[in-house]
Amino acid sequence: MERYESLFAQLKERKEGAFVPFVTLGDPGIEQSLKIIDTLIEAGADALELGIPFSDPLADGPTIQNATLRAFAAGVTPAQCIEMLALIRQKHPTIPIGLLMYANLVFNKGIDEFYAQCEKVGVDSVLVADVPVEESAPFRQAALRHNVAPIFICPPNADDDLLRQIASYGRGYTYLLSRAGVTGAENRAALPLNHLVAKLKEYNAAPPLQGFGISAPDQVKAAIDAGAAGAISGSAIVKIIEQHINEPEKMLAALKAFVQPMKAATRS
């Protein structure tokens, strides 16, 4: 959890926002997936948001669903994802690592055991996409017991009660949704979210990172200008993986070329 705090403190000092890429662990296979993650970090990623392949991803649009299918086709299991996380953490000791996943994968292990495993391999945060704030008590309590930040989604239509709960229960960062619906780069982020950002700050919420539909540097800049601490980009990155599925080296070069200007946009 502390890795987020020190990241945001460092970025504040440098007057930068955070750029956080999302990929699915094991897409398109374990070895290439690890290379992809190294490339994202080398190209300037400030933190990682990683998905564990799940058979019924409700919040995801077709791009990320396809990533999940590719990981399944490669035979990737949740246990292998945990091993991958341990490898990523060994290689990159300071970068915050967040998981974005679904409740079933947590239940399969047992809630406490799942968060214990996260702590052991060096995961900093977990966002359980299909658990609303009002049902989150067993998840967030287990998370905090194991020094893992529970992350909550702040939708664009959040009312005051929800904003207060998110501020009170969330740690690490707040996932600020650009718009309703499923993930996807083709649905551009709708701004402005200034009023939400102002309220979250007022209630001392964890720093907001804006996600959903972030696929260009101008959107990263707009998110930060609206007061967000940074931006998360998933579908646009996963699309690059899809486009170069048979050319692993080209894929890594294209990912680097995408991430560098996205990170540069946090420095304006």
Swiss-Prot record:
Transmembrane segments: none annotated. The active site is at 49 (proton acceptor), 60 (proton acceptor). CDD domains: Tryptophan_synthase_alpha. Keywords: Amino-acid biosynthesis, Aromatic amino acid biosynthesis, Lyase, Tryptophan biosynthesis. GO terms for molecular function: tryptophan synthase activity. Pathway: Amino-acid biosynthesis; L-tryptophan biosynthesis; L-tryptophan from chorismate: step 5/5. It comes from the Bacteria. The keyword Amino-acid biosynthesis applies. GO terms for cellular component: cytosol. It is an enzyme of class 4 (lyase). Pfam families: Trp_syntA. It catalyses: (1S,2R)-1-C-(indol-3-yl)glycerol 3-phosphate + L-serine = D-glyceraldehyde 3-phosphate + L-tryptophan + H2O. InterPro entries: Aldolase_TIM, RibuloseP-bd_barrel, Trp_synthase_alpha_AS, Trp_synthase_suA. Its EC number is 4.2.1.20. NCBIfam families: trpA. Tetramer of two alpha and two beta chains. Belongs to the TrpA family. The alpha subunit is responsible for the aldol cleavage of indoleglycerol phosphate to indole and glyceraldehyde 3-phosphate. This is Tryptophan synthase alpha chain. The gene is trpA.
